């Protein structure tokens, strides 16, 4: 039973009614002994003394839990006549865009892979990429043309020297009278030997001419992201290819044959760059040029 209990029991409560079983006890022959010092007290008087200990705890009103005031529901929240359909359904029905993005990225990656493999396969002779300011020249196989000049003819033999033998003179003396002493004998000195030496011809000096150098040049405008390949003829007459070169590009070689001009070709991978080419010698002579501003040029 909840709630506070009154300090005393109500006389009308059935629990407070005294129960007297004296008739039964007497009939059964069982008599309870009287309590010492208790007198004749009824059971109801004995339970009243311990009633204060059996009361339930009653909380004060300040601790009672009370609900807030009643607020009726707003009927406008349940009005579906003015409900507008959300645009999220349209977004869900629209086709997603990410498959297109993934497809385009896959195509670009495949094209880049094919281009990279083709570049690695088609350059067996090139070991490094060319830079914009790098010019290299292959050493000539034959530096100069050597000519052997004939030895000068030996000088003619000198004629033998001419010597004259003096003739002996005999002097006869007469002992009749001592004549005056004879004059001293005169001896003729031999003329000096004449030696005729032929003048040697002046030596012929041959000045070797330096080998002619040929410069290949590629000019124009390179588009961003484009790959330009250049093919030229080296000093030995073999075709060389350089990939992904910078513009302007130049290469100087010394061909073995002085009559060989060589050739140079340049091409754009994506055909968006404008290229020109020229071939000039070391003295500035233009052997060939092409200024078509096209994605592919050759000289």
Curated annotation (Swiss-Prot):
Region (Disordered): 1-72, 128-213
Location, primary (coarse class): membrane
Compartment annotation: Cell membrane
Membrane topology: Single-pass membrane protein
Domain of life: Bacteria
Bias-annotated ranges (Low complexity): 164-176
Pfam families registered for this protein in UniProt: Mycobact_memb
Location of N-acetylserine modifications: 2
Biased composition (Polar residues): 128-139
Segments passing through the bilayer: 101-121
Compositional bias of kind Pro residues: 150-163, 177-193
InterPro entries linked: MmpS, MmpS_C
Gene Ontology, cellular component aspect: peptidoglycan-based cell wall; plasma membrane
Keywords: Acetylation, Cell membrane, Membrane, Transmembrane, Transmembrane helix
Family, similarity comment: Belongs to the MmpS family.
Protein name: Probable transport accessory protein MmpS3
Native species: Mycobacterium tuberculosis (strain ATCC 25618 / H37Rv)
Gene behind the chain: mmpS3
